[in-house]
Amino acid sequence: MATVKFKYKGEEKEVDISKIKKVWRVGKMISFTYDEGGGKTGRGAVSEKDAPKELLQMLEKQKK
């Protein structure tokens, strides 16, 4: 499975694509929420050019 690498509040993070719940576009950034485990939801964003193709595919599916 693919992973998404991003920075959130100055901290480098990496999350598996399978844990991502919701994806949306904000300008040239792709924002998302993901399951952190223990009932917590995390969020992150990555630039469109750095986003893995699986994340972009999820975005297209949610538009429909």
UniProtKB/Swiss-Prot annotation:
**Where is it mostly found?**
cytoplasm
Recorded protein name is DNA-binding protein 7d
InterPro entries linked: Chromo-like_dom_sf (IPR016197), DNA-bd_7a-e_arc (IPR003212)
Q: Which UniProt keywords apply?
A: Cytoplasm, DNA-binding, Methylation
GO CC field: cytoplasm
Q: Which NCBIfam families match?
A: Sul7d
Species name for this entry? Saccharolobus solfataricus (strain ATCC 35092 / DSM 1617 / JCM 11322 / P2)
Q: Which residues carry this modification: N6-methyllysine?
A: 5, 7, 61, 63-64
Where does the UniProt annotation locate this protein? Cytoplasm
* Thermal behavior of activity: Hyperthermostable.
**Quaternary data:** Monomer.
> Does Cytoplasm appear among the keywords?
yes
